């Protein structure tokens, strides 16, 4: 079962949290759900260069709170916070309510190469540049290992290297216990558009096990190049506060 079901959905409430946190009536639920989908599509389409790995949405009364986890917070924030205001206006336009209070928090991803979505995005970019898929996978594995992950699995499917018959190729390094519910598995998918068609990319990253109320921390390992062990940046939007 662990190989069939979505790793995040299987672990909701155990090691994973919901990407949207709000309550609604049966009448409003589909409306708000579609709003969340439009917001996420808008953010990933317009700010794809910012390396956004996750978008968390929370609703409190008439306030909409959006938390963005990104590898390049400077691209989102802009000069003197001008990017935040532009993003807020774009979200209000997307949901069709310019009077809605939108609060935006930008959090920097501490380990870029240990994030499944960002690693899948890197693989997609390399494949779209016509880099051989085996070389791309090998480079992605090396980057993740330098970031200190406990294990990872990468699968690429489609017309690999322009072959006539589509197939799947995968590799695994370390442990990826998909059947263990307490295992913290970071899972992401991405599509690469090539001249031969689309390639599907799946990435599983094992970050440790949650034992009771305490999580087994990821080994420190080697730090990413040129980034050091500096503290991750966090930009909290306080413009709506009195």
From Swiss-Prot:
GO terms for cellular component: cytosolic small ribosomal subunit. GO terms for biological process: translation. Residues 39-110 form the KH type-2 domain. One of its GO terms (molecular function) is structural constituent of ribosome. Residues 216-242 are annotated as: Disordered. Part of the 30S ribosomal subunit. Forms a tight complex with proteins S10 and S14. Belongs to the universal ribosomal protein uS3 family. This is Small ribosomal subunit protein uS3. It comes from Prochlorococcus marinus (strain MIT 9303).
């Amino acid at each position: 079962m662990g190989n069939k079901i979505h790793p995040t959905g299987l672990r909701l409430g155990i090691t994973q949290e919901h990407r949207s946190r709000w309550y609604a009536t049966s009448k409003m639920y589909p409306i708000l759900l579609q709003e969340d989908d439009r917001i996420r599509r808008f953010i990933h389409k317009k700010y794809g260069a910012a390396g956004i790995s996750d978008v968390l949405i929370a609703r409190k009364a008439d306030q909409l709170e959006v938390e963005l986890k990104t590898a390049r917070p400077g691209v989102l924030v802009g000069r003197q916070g001008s990017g935040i205001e532009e993003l807020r206006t774009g979200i209000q336009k997307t949901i069709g309510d310019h009077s809605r209070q939108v609060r935006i928090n930008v959090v920097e991803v501490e380990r870029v190469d240990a994030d499944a979505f960002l690693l899948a995005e890197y693989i997609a970019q390399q494949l779209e540049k016509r880099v051989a898929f085996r070389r791309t996978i090998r480079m992605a594995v090396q980057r993740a290992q330098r970031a200190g992950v406990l294990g990872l699995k990468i699968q690429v499917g489609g017309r690999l290297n322009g072959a006539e018959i589509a197939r799947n190729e995968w590799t695994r390094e370390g442990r990826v216990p998909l059947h263990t519910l307490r295992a913290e598995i970071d899972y992401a998918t991405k599509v690469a558009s090539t001249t031969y068609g689309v390639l599907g990319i799946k990435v599983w990253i094992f970050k440790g096990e949650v034992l009771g109320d305490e999580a087994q921390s990821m080994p420190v390992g080697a730090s990413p190049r040129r980034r050091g062990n500096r503290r991750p940046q966090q930009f909290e939007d306080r413009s709506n506060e009195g």
